[in-house]
Amino acid sequence: MPAPYEKGSAKKGATLFKTRCLQCHTTEAGGAHKVGPNLNGVFGRHSGQAEGYSYTDANKQKGALWEAQTMSDYLENPKKYIPGTKMAFGGLKKAKDRNDLVTYLLSATK
């Protein structure tokens, strides 16, 4: 079972985002989708729901409500959390890294 989400360092999370996520995702309001969807407004939304992005059926059917804990669980191993996702990212195995990244995303995607 994944570790419970705990608030981490948004600064360290920003660095993780730049090195591990930015190639495929944006966070700013009105930002374009890249290989992956723009993450602006992701929290409080269900998986597979970013307008204008083409998701796999698996992602749409999962119906996960993106909150800090579900995002952390997903980021540990995306292909295990949503079998059939096209997200190529292998995941963040360390709970501290996930906490930092989710803490950053909570502020960067508002």
UniProtKB/Swiss-Prot annotation:
Where does the UniProt entry say this protein principally localizes?
Answer: mitochondrion
Q: List the disulfide bonds.
A: none
Q: Name one Pfam family in it.
A: Cytochrom_C
Which GO molecular function annotations are given, in alphabetical order? electron transfer activity; heme binding; metal ion binding
Where does the record place the modification N6,N6,N6-trimethyllysine? K79
Protein's UniProt keywords contain Endoplasmic reticulum: no
Subcellular location as annotated = Mitochondrion intermembrane space
Q: Point out the gene that encodes the protein.
A: CYC1
Keyword Transmembrane helix belongs to the record: no
InterPro entries hit by this protein: Cyt_c-like_dom (IPR009056), Cyt_c-like_dom_sf (IPR036909), Cyt_c_1A/1B (IPR002327)
| Positions that bind heme c | C21, C24, H25, M87
Q: Which family does it belong to?
A: Belongs to the cytochrome c family.
User: What does the record say about PTM?
Assistant: Binds 1 heme c group covalently per subunit.
Keywords, alphabetical: Electron transport, Heme, Iron, Metal-binding, Methylation, Mitochondrion, Respiratory chain, Transport
Q: What does this protein do?
A: Electron carrier protein. The oxidized form of the cytochrome c heme group can accept an electron from the heme group of the cytochrome c1 subunit of cytochrome reductase. Cytochrome c then transfers this electron to the cytochrome oxidase complex, the final protein carrier in the mitochondrial electron-transport chain.
Q: Which Gene3D superfamilies does this entry report, sorted A to Z?
A: Cytochrome c-like domain (1.10.760.10)
Q: Name the GO cellular-component terms.
A: mitochondrial intermembrane space
The protein in question is named: Cytochrome c
Q: What SUPFAM superfamilies does the annotation carry?
A: Cytochrome c (SSF46626)
